[in-house]
A protein has these predicted regions:
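Alpha-helical transmembrane segments of polytopic membrane proteins
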Residues: 1, 48-63, 100-108, 152-159
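Symmetry-related core transmembrane helices of the 12-TM Major Facilitator Superfamily/SLC fold
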Residues: 1-7, 149-174
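Flexible interhelical linker loops that connect adjacent transmembrane helices
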Residues: 1-27
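Loop-to-transmembrane helix entry
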Residues: 19-24, 41-61, 80
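Helix-loop boundary and gating motifs at the non-cytosolic
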Residues: 24-47, 116
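Helix-to-loop junctions at the C-terminal end of transmembrane segments
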Residues: 61-78
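C-terminal transmembrane helical hairpin of 12-TM major facilitator-type secondary transporters
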Residues: 75-115
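A late C-terminal transmembrane helix in Major Facilitator Superfamily
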Residues: 121-158
Length: 182
């Protein structure tokens, strides 16, 4: 844990100490980077140029507040983030700028808080390795997808991520059932 952050009660620490996998964090950064870079280059839809600044700012703040104060289980957070990214991509594909300017900033802020809560617990060496994968590889791959106009392949990633999350939940449910039977 960090010495720079205030200590919280043990009840709060339980929910904040959930670490998310490097795979999940890389996926979120990739999805964000690919959508952000695609949006930046798309002249047919722009949530920044089309006057949605208030919605964007408001839902960034709401995303931070929700990530900090709503206590939900790790798998539920992962599923929520994936669903919100899927909705963001859906609203991008169907050119629904208003709803995109609400959902996308919310998920950006929400997942960033979740990532920061995970990274703050890592030692410097581990953090350096994570930053290579998160900051360079995942974001660079997202940029590549946008530059090469491969954004339509992203829905396949949603399917793979959803299957991974559902499989993890099923395994945890089986383990819980097995432990409860003793």
């Amino acid at each position: 844990t960090s010495t720079l952050l205030p200590h919280t009660s043990s009840a709060k620490k339980v929910s904040l100490t959930e670490s998310f996998s490097l795979f999940a964090m890389m996926l979120w950064i990739f999805l964000d980077s690919a959508l952000f870079e695609s949006l930046s280059r798309d002249i047919s839809i722009s949530i920044w140029r089309d006057g949605y600044s208030l919605e964007i700012a408001l839902f960034h703040i709401i995303g931070v507040v929700c990530a900090l104060y709503f206590k939900i289980q790790k798998n539920q957070k992962e599923l929520l983030i994936i669903i919100l990214f899927a909705l963001s991509y859906l609203f991008y594909f169907i050119q629904e700028a208003l709803i995109l300017s609400i959902v996308y900033p919310f998920v950006i802020s929400f997942y960033n808080v979740v990532i920061l809560q995970t990274l703050v617990k890592k030692d410097l060496k581990t953090l350096s390795i994570y930053m290579i994968f998160i900051g360079w590889i995942a974001s660079g791959t997202g940029l590549f997808v946008a530059l090469e106009n491969l954004i339509l392949f992203v829905p396949m990633l949603f399917l793979m991520a959803l299957l991974k999350i559902l499989n993890t939940q099923q395994i945890q449910h089986k383990e819980k059932t097995c432990l409860n039977s003793f």
